[in-house]
Amino acid sequence: MTDIAQLLGKDADNLLQHRCMTIPSGQLYLPGHDYVDRVMIDNNRPPAVLRNMQTLYNTGRLAGTGYLSILPVDQGVEHSAGASFAANPLYFDPKNIVELAIEAGCNCVASTYGVLASVSRRYAHRIPFLVKLNHNETLSYPNTYDQTLYASVEQAFNMGAVAVGATIYFGSEESRRQIEEISAAFERAHELGMVTVLWAYLRNSAFKKDGVDYHVSADLTGQANHLAATIGADIVKQKMAENNGGYKAINYGYTDDRVYSKLTSENPIDLVRYQLANCYMGRAGLINSGGAAGGETDLSDAVRTAVINKRAGGMGLILGRKAFKKSMADGVKLINAVQDVYLDSKITIA
């Protein structure tokens, strides 16, 4: 097992010993081996959705824990294939993307329709597929930031996918159209028995003010999570909160002083717990993103993110660039270290 305390360094005590005095853990619907029977059984999802959610939970190194380790590789569209795969050209071949997820013991592999369709007959029965339905792309000039549907729910279903995913840029001029598109897509996905995952991201240049990036503020990302759950996301993917007070700094929308005085603190675990509270207190699972590849600190950064997510009550990590921009062996090692956080019974809910 990974020496988690050593990787956390000077933050170890602050993260491993923290007690949450904001939102009590007893009010949350926490991950566990019985999550489908205990939590999802209340909702209106068809039985096939519950079956496919259980398939996710029963796969990989985290099988039976209620936690998820997902490998996402959709960056070939989002960030260009060259920028994404030049470090490891083997990942131009979709086969190797799926092999990385299998070798690392992930619950699921998430990618574009094209990537997964090209190898679906060989792999769809070996590891659960999550098809990302929409993407931003950076080939258009000048660059714009919008999400375009690249595939249909039916295409994902026909290749054997157990889940679909999509991004909404909440706060952008295009967000209301995206909400309508993805709400309809998620409705259809549930009809076909598939799990729905929303990348609930913020996007607006006004969210950066006085040198602070409020795209990762707990209050604004929390509301994005609430909207994600509103349109039927079974799992919400969110960037880890790094600050708070976005509503106040930008001076728009609605908030309450108690969000900052009682429901959050400066501890990152409490900030992520507020993100989770906005996922209907955990009735929709919260997975945090692993972030960009940063070099030598990738392992410690990924473990830190996993510890915060787990102790806040989150459901796992969706980590891609930190893994696939390394050799396959090093990528597997990094993903396994993250999984070790969720397998370690000593790392408890704060």
Language-model features: locations:
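Alpha/beta enzyme core
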Residues: 25-30, 63, 76-109, 114-287, ...
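Histidine/acidic-residue-rich catalytic or RNA/ligand-binding cores of hydrolases
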Residues: 297-303, 327-336
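A short, acidic, flexible beta-alpha connecting loop/helix-capping segment that sits on the rim
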Residues: 321-327
